Amino acid sequence: MHNLLEIKIIRFLRNVFYFLHVLFNECLDTLKAYYKRWRGMKSEKPLDPSSRRARIIQATGVDLSRDPAMQSLRGVYHMAKSILYADVLRTAVRGGNAPNSSLVNYRTKEKCNILDFMKPGRPLVVNFGSCSUPPFMASFEIFSRIIDSYHERADFLTVYIEEAHSSDLWALKNNKYSIPSHITFEDRMEAAAIFKKSVSFECAFAVDTMKDETNLSYGALPERTAIILDGKVQYIGGIGPFNYDLVELEKELIAVLKK
């Protein structure tokens, strides 16, 4: 068994490789686009309406692969912050004890903990994100469908965390959701209210504290998913935005339900 330090080092090195891979692909796509314009070549083929990119554009107005903020030095910094920093700090690991981090119940406005939403013998499926994160908002319809399909056998929780693309720090061009960084908890609750009005879902809803305890415990920035069963982490999803995969989440939930 690896000790905690070894696990964090391995995770850090894996995330560095992933970060460089993403950065290389982003730079390559940008160079290809510039080359096509320079050569006067035809633009790319029409976008498939069912594709992830098309869903994000339709839901939020943002084209991540063409957004200047994603290709800027600030973009590199924030990607490194979420991929390298937040994920290395997380204590939630598959097979380990689920961190019982602090939250505030959106409906009651009372302090609570994440495991308060867990019931014995039933998986708790957690979805972390914020309004300003395009993949999170664009995919929420899929998450709602998963809730509808499995709510009789599992419980679901959405946790609102810090803004992934706040308007004052790392704004995305044409983003439908222009929300500044949360300075006070009231700011975060107001952002959560915007989210609640923007999407339709039937599950528990909680808001992270201003200490970002849940965000840090689960490496949730910019968005992430997790499945908890009887206090153990059964699944921890990939780092958003590129590895935020609700299809994978559903497959993992089916596997947990078969246990």
Curated annotation (Swiss-Prot):
Inhibited by gold thioglucose (GTG) and iodoacetate (IAc). It is found in: Membrane; Nucleus. PANTHER family: IODOTHYRONINE DEIODINASE (PTHR11781), TYPE I IODOTHYRONINE DEIODINASE (PTHR11781:SF22). One of its GO terms (molecular function) is thyroxine 5'-deiodinase activity. This is Thyroxine 5'-deiodinase. It holds the Pfam family T4_deiodinase. Belongs to the iodothyronine deiodinase family. Responsible for the deiodination of T4 (3,5,3',5'-tetraiodothyronine) into T3 (3,5,3'-triiodothyronine). Can also produce 3,3'-diiodothyronine from reverse T3 (rT3, 3,3',5'-triiodothyronine). Does not have significant inner-ring deiodination activity for T4, T3 or rT3. Keywords: Membrane, Nucleus, Oxidoreductase, Selenocysteine, Thyroid hormones biosynthesis. It is an enzyme of class 1 (oxidoreductase). The active site is at residue 133. The keyword Nucleus applies. The keyword Membrane applies. GO terms for cellular component: membrane; nucleus. It catalyses: 3,3',5-triiodo-L-thyronine + iodide + A + H(+) = L-thyroxine + AH2. Optimum pH is 7. Its EC number is 1.21.99.4.
